[in-house]
Curated annotation (Swiss-Prot):
Domain PUA, first and last residues per copy: 94-170
Originating organism: Dictyostelium discoideum
Function recorded in the entry: Required for proper 27S pre-rRNA processing and 60S ribosome subunit assembly.
Taxonomic lineage: Eukaryota, Amoebozoa, Evosea, Eumycetozoa, Dictyostelia
The protein's name: 60S ribosome subunit biogenesis protein NIP7 homolog
PROSITE patterns per UniProt: PUA
SUPFAM superfamilies xrefs: Pre-PUA domain, PUA domain-like
Length: 179
């Protein structure tokens, strides 16, 4: 595992800031113990520094995963968040969307969220903003990007698109062989 380059860090943190805002600093400057981000085979991992030091004896070829995978860099250099980071996104999310029970399964099958399935949305959520989706019982079920602001959502018809799908907990089953 290696530290990220400056360009990789810039791309990664821009994507992360879109979802959790300035709370990114809370991920790195934790009170319990220091954590860091490391790259292994184009995947970014969030790992404690103590665990990182202990893993230095393991050869790169033998190391599959270490810590929590936040996502991966594509061949074009873009960063794609992975569903495995949902716990951290949900904990520090700036903007949240709650999904009605009737639309939860549709979301978990990889579909976008329509206005008819929107339970609640954080006030003053802008358009094209990263959001974390929750069930009405406050269980995180995925993340996406809003298509409209909170103010615009109130005036939409029930079949209008509200949140573009980006990741959901159903990916654990659909993509279990590549995770």
């Amino acid at each position: 595992m290696r530290p990220m380059t400056e360009e990789e860090s810039k791309t990664f943190f821009e994507k992360l800031i879109k979802f959790i805002g300035k709370n990114v600093t809370l991920l790195i400057q934790r009170k319990d113990e220091p954590y860091c981000f490391r790259i292994q085979k184009n995947k970014v991992y969030y790992v404690s520094e103590e665990l990182m030091k202990r893993s230095q004896n393991i050869p790169r070829e033998g190391l599959c995963s270490l810590g929590t995978c936040f996502g991966r860099f594509t061949k074009t250099g873009k960063f794609k968040l992975n569903i495995t980071c949902l716990d951290y996104l949900a904990q520090y999310a700036k903007y949240k969307v709650w999904v009605k029970p009737s639309s939860e399964m549709s979301w978990m099958y990889g579909n976008n969220l329509l206005k008819a399935g929107l339970g609640r949305i954080t006030e003053d959520t802008p358009a094209n903003q990263g959001v974390v989706l929750f069930s009405m019982n406050d269980v995180p079920i995925g993340f996406g990007v809003t298509s409209k602001s909170t103010h615009e959502c109130r005036k939409l018809d029930p079949q209008a698109l509200v949140v573009y799908h980006y990741g959901d907990v159903g990916e654990y089953l659909r993509d279990e062989d590549i995770m």
